[in-house]
């Protein structure tokens, strides 16, 4: 399958290094954007959760790639994702996959932030889902690992988790912050 450019909701290409909100492609009942949130009694917002309301955009992320420093993002670009702003209590705002108690969840931080869990090495990709939406997938570095869709665990706080192939993925679109609201680094 040929790699295609990834587009934002206004039809512009999505670029490495720019800021975007990742929000549900399903208007209304689908919920809103994503942000770090507290789960499992942790004091620090380490898990990545989806806002309940579609009026809430969550917090913007920035995509980077170990392969190149700038340019357009394609459906085969290996990505790192990080929130533009980091909670003070976390080591990093970079997205990671943490395996603990049988679940692989999407979180932020480094290994010090997740003493109970195991961080899975790998990278994220954006894949097309229908004509206008996308899904995020995670591809482990281990040769045996094939990529898994990122979905939502609706029990509790709508946390983002790796899904097995038969579950439905989190359908997303990318929204550029309105100019003026974007924080210049």
Swiss-Prot record:
It is found in: Secreted. GO terms for cellular component: extracellular region. InterPro entries: Kunitz_inhibitor_STI-like_sf, Prot_inh_Kunz-lg. GO terms for molecular function: serine-type endopeptidase inhibitor activity. Gene3D superfamilies: 2.80.10.50. Keywords: Disulfide bond, Protease inhibitor, Secreted, Serine protease inhibitor. This is Kunitz-type serine protease inhibitor DrTI.
